[in-house]
Amino acid sequence: MNAPHRDETTASHRDDGFFTESLESRDPEIFAASQKELGRQRDEIELIASENIVSAAVMEAQGGVMTNKYAEGYPGRRYYGGCQYVDIAEELAIDRAKQLFGCDFANVQPNSGSQANQGVFTALLQPGDTILGMSLDAGGHLTHGARPNQSGKWFNAVQYGVREGDLEIDYDQIAALAAEHKPKMIIAGGSAIPRIIDFARMREIADTIGAYLLVDMAHFAGMVASGHYPSPFPHAHVATTTTHKTLRGPRGGMIVTNDEAIAKKVNSAIFPGIQGGPLMHVIAGKAVAFGEALRPEFRDYQTQVIANAQALAAQLIKGGLDIVTGGTDTHLMLVDLRAKGVKGNATEKALGRAHITCNKNGIPFDTEKPMVTSGLRLGSPAGTTRGFGEAEFRQIADWIVEVVDGLAANGEDANDAVEAKVRGEVQALCDRFPIYPNL
């Protein structure tokens, strides 16, 4: 019997390294960029509050074969065959999410926190409806009705802020705006809120006008899961989150609720409403991260995240920097730089040259432009994942003060010596707390 004919194209394809060749060999430019990014993460202190460092297991799941699978629909109800194994991953992610947040329904398909919010809007609102969210200037998020965002274009977006005295959320203003504008949805949460939000008060206001309460817990979801931050439930009708940040998972989004009717609308809004096939490799990574978050050590991690943030804030205050609201209850803080006479953009760059990564950020009632700002946003999740404790974060605060004082005294073009000194000390600290030794 003759051997089956071997197609030359197939033979060539299988022998050309497609399934075996390393990234370094196949695409040296991307490999080089990836290695440089690995070096940056290893050798610099990450203080961006919305960033974290995932486990090797999460990265392995994200880089696995589930990236090949199209899976439109939901587990057990797919539009393609061959989904029996990716169904396992999504079902695990859903079940673990429900355990983490004590809720009855979870949709783990949103590709980002922004798409999770868009999914809720699609499920519960109509274009032209009124929404009430925190202004970006006060610490809100683009997707809560900011004018440049789709949420500010499709909806009549009314914005609330903070009190001028203590710079905390102005619940009386929210109540007044709700009574005046009758929004269909009130949004709690934001991207730069250092204090715990009063969800009960927000729901009370929502109920007076029959509005939905959406809690965007993207920044503090990890602390909700560990019990360090009050749960949005039973107050929220629905909650959204990213799956990175304090949850320490892959970049993605999620929607959770206890309301079955809302859950059905949300599922239809995500697929087929605003997304097609979900990213199954990312959902696998989410499942792994949620499993990690169910372990006792995750609670210990969140305890340290908060302790580190508070140590950082207190030491910065000792160094003469102002902290918005005077401190933090969470993982993040806003630093008011006006007393030092420097801007957020220049300070971000100076700290970056010293290998301390953070982001410029507007402060409440800031008069500077968004690309300039009078402040910085700092966070502790990534450093805590590395193993830093309060002592390390107090040292980091001292370095920040040193760079800021140098910038104020010397200017951007003459602060090299200070930045180089701090950069060397940062390297020594990072060497003591390595990440990804097998990469």
Swiss-Prot record:
Gene3D superfamilies: Aspartate Aminotransferase, domain 1 (3.90.1150.10), Type I PLP-dependent aspartate aminotransferase-like (Major domain) (3.40.640.10). InterPro entries: PyrdxlP-dep_Trfase (IPR015424), PyrdxlP-dep_Trfase_major (IPR015421), PyrdxlP-dep_Trfase_small (IPR015422), Ser_HO-MeTrfase (IPR001085), Ser_HO-MeTrfase-like (IPR049943), Ser_HO-MeTrfase_PLP_BS (IPR019798), SHMT-like_dom (IPR039429). Keywords: Amino-acid biosynthesis, Cytoplasm, One-carbon metabolism, Pyridoxal phosphate, Transferase. It is found in: Cytoplasm. Transmembrane segments: none annotated. Pfam families: SHMT. The record marks 244 as: Plays an important role in substrate specificity. (6S)-5,6,7,8-tetrahydrofolate binds at residues 136, 140-142. Residues 1-20 are annotated as: Disordered. The modification N6-(pyridoxal phosphate)lysine is found at residue 245. GO terms for molecular function: glycine hydroxymethyltransferase activity; pyridoxal phosphate binding. Pathway: One-carbon metabolism; tetrahydrofolate interconversion; Amino-acid biosynthesis; glycine biosynthesis; glycine from L-serine: step 1/1. Belongs to the SHMT family. Homodimer. This is Serine hydroxymethyltransferase. It comes from Jannaschia sp. (strain CCS1). The gene is glyA.
